Design a protein with these regions (language model features):
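Compositionally biased terminal segments of proteins
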Residues: 1-198
Length: 198
């Protein structure tokens, strides 16, 4: 089993894995699967400042094809020497009860340049930032969630506590940020303002 070791995944490794998955879904299953990508991978695939991630957090959008998508991910793990859980659906605790298609952008179809077997959608930067605000309630390695929130806020152009709260509420209506996350918003806004260009 290759579960025990962690591998740093970069852009090329991830899109190569999507190619393998797409070919498998098309050729072995005769279907087109769809996944929505979140977290570090969604940032890595959209921005040059995120270079690596440990895994690919997804939801499988084609529920009737869930087992085929999981089989394709397992096949890609074996083919490319990736950990068994390189693609996982552990993201549920940080998503709202209902997600709109407007929260996502189309990233691509795989395999690249061939008949498709996999469609990949990415969480938009605004949605990722709201999710990172929610994640501030927990501690993360090297305070990664905080740093990601700073970078995402810079990308979308918000830099005040009020704007951060409004952003969170727009994606998580009816929810309030945990007190530990709320307590970090002034520090977050200050860091965003310090790093803002110009």
């Amino acid at each position: 089993m290759n579960n025990a070791r962690r591998v740093a995944l970069d852009f090329e490794t991830i899109v190569n894995a999507f190619d393998v998955m797409g070919r498998y879904l098309r050729d072995q299953c005769g279907v087109v699967g769809e996944i929505a990508v979140y977290g570090g991978t969604a940032m890595l695939l959209q921005f040059p400042w995120r270079k690596m991630t440990e895994d690919v957090d997804v939801t499988i959008l084609t529920g009737e094809r869930e087992s085929a998508v999981k089989d394709a991910a397992a096949f890609a793990a074996v083919r490319l020497g990736l950990p068994d859980d390189w693609l996982n659906n552990y993201v549920g605790g940080f998503t709202p009860e209902t997600e709109s298609q407007a929260f996502f952008s189309t990233f691509g179809v795989y395999p690249r340049g061939e008949a498709p077997g996999l469609r990949v959608f990415l969480a938009k930067p605004e949605y990722l930032c709201a999710m990172k605000l929610k994640a501030l309630e927990r501690e993360s390695v090297d305070d990664r969630d905080f740093e990601d929130a700073v970078n995402l806020a810079l990308e979308i152009g918000i830099d005040t506590v009020d704007h951060l709260k409004q952003l969170f509420t727009s994606f998580f209506p009816g929810e309030t940020l945990h007190s530990s996350a709320l307590a970090r918003l002034p520090e977050l806004a200050e860091k965003i303002q310090l790093r803002r260009p110009g």
